[in-house]
């Protein structure tokens, strides 16, 4: 409720938000109650050009309208029980992930070149369009490509493999090629407006998350700046996932660990920033032929384990024995 007792459904319902302030908020990218509710007073003040006291009041009222508050563990359990899942195309991989790719969560796939990261991204951008009884969400996908690896030919083949009309399936994928790290971050900053206009969006993919940051901020002298920007970028994606009940998938590369003499000599790029932000981290490895190995590296609610899946002409499938 606003101060005058009116139920708050949009920014214009907030007390003290006239057309002038509303225009400033929208122009700054704060076009919904959710965006305002999770902003900091300082960020909102600077971005919209309004006093910090005004920003604090607007944020407080938006949070009250959205019921952002402490919750009991039972309430959290009920919310988790309502988490939706998207099939990967492989029952074995779905089982490893606890039923598929979760909404409200960031899932990271990392591995060497050819380990299946991009193939999985293509497949899941098709799977999200399926009806719920077939493992989808009747939704659309946003695909942010940082390395130029998106291939419409694979989308077309996977759509046919899933029984979808290829042109319709491709029309349900919003694609953007990010040319540098600033552009990549700007795309995500603008996503909220797109999601507000098209609530059918249920999946965001960034393939890959770190490539531009590594190229533009090399060396130890740039490490702090790189990690700060990457951390902000990751948290913006998590915020979108939680606000709009969307699944977020990021892919990541690996690098050698010269200090490792036993076990896996590689580790995911991104350091501690990427170790802690994704809710689920999955390592992918090549196997024989079209087979790939997926291993849970970190997920607080899932047991460790690994499975084998296959990449076929029609998409990601269970591996044949």
Swiss-Prot record:
Keywords, in A-Z order: ATP-binding, DNA damage, DNA recombination, DNA-binding, Nucleotide-binding
Organism domain of life: Archaea
SMART domains cross-referenced by the UniProt entry: AAA
Record-listed ATP binding positions: 111-118
Pfam families in alphabetical order: HHH_5, Rad51
GO molecular function (one): damaged DNA binding
InterPro entries, alphabetized: AAA+_ATPase, DNA_recomb/repair_Rad51_C, DNA_recomb/repair_RadA, DNA_recomb/repair_RecA-like, DNA_repair_Rad51/TF_NusA_a-hlx, P-loop_NTPase, RecA_ATP-bd, RecA_monomer-monomer_interface
GO BP annotations listed: DNA recombination; DNA repair
Described purpose of this protein according to its UniProt entry: Involved in DNA repair and in homologous recombination. Binds and assemble on single-stranded DNA to form a nucleoprotein filament. Hydrolyzes ATP in a ssDNA-dependent manner and promotes DNA strand exchange between homologous DNA molecules.
PANTHER family attached to this UniProt entry: MEIOTIC RECOMBINATION PROTEIN DMC1_LIM15 HOMOLOG, RECA/RAD51/RADA DNA STRAND-PAIRING FAMILY MEMBER
Family: Belongs to the eukaryotic RecA-like protein family.
Protein name according to UniProt: DNA repair and recombination protein RadA
Organism listed in the record: Sulfolobus acidocaldarius (strain ATCC 33909 / DSM 639 / JCM 8929 / NBRC 15157 / NCIMB 11770)
């Amino acid at each position: 409720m606003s101060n005058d007792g009116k139920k708050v459904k949009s920014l214009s319902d907030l007390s003290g938000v006239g057309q002038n302030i509303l225009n400033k908020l929208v122009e700054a990218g704060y076009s919904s109650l959710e965006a305002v509710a999770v902003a900091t007073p300082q960020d909102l003040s600077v971005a919209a050009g309004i006093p910090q006291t005004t920003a604090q009041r607007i944020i407080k009222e938006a949070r009250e309208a959205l019921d952002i508050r402490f919750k009991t563990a039972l309430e959290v359990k009920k919310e988790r029980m309502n988490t939706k899942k998207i099939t990967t195309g492989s029952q074995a991989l779905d089982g490893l992930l606890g039923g598929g790719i979760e909404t409200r969560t960031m899932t990271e796939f990392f591995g060497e070149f050819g380990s299946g990261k991009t193939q999985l991204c293509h497949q899941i951008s098709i799977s999200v369009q399926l009806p719920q009884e077939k493992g989808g969400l009747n939704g659309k996908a946003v695909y942010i490509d940082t390395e130029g690896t998106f291939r419409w030919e694979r989308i077309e083949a996977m759509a046919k493999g899933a029984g979808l009309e290829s042109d319709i399936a491709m029309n349900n994928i919003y694609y953007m090629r990010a040319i540098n790290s600033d552009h990549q971050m700007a795309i995500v900053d603008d996503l909220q407006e797109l999601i507000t206009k098209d609530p059918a969006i249920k999946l965001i993919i960034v393939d890959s998350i770190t490539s531009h940051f590594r190229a533009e901020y090399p060396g130890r002298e740039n490490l702090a700046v790189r990690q700060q920007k990457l951390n902000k970028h990751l948290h913006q994606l998590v915020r979108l996932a939680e606000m709009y009940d969307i699944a977020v998938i990021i892919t990541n590369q690996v690098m050698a660990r010269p200090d490792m003499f036993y076990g896996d000599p590689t580790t995911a790029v991104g350091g501690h920033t990427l170790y802690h932000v994704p809710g689920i981290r999955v390592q992918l490895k090549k196997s024989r032929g079209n087979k790939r190995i997926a291993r849970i590296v970190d997920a607080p609610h899932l047991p460790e384990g690994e499975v084998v899946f296959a990449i076929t002409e029609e998409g990601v499938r269970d591996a044949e024995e």
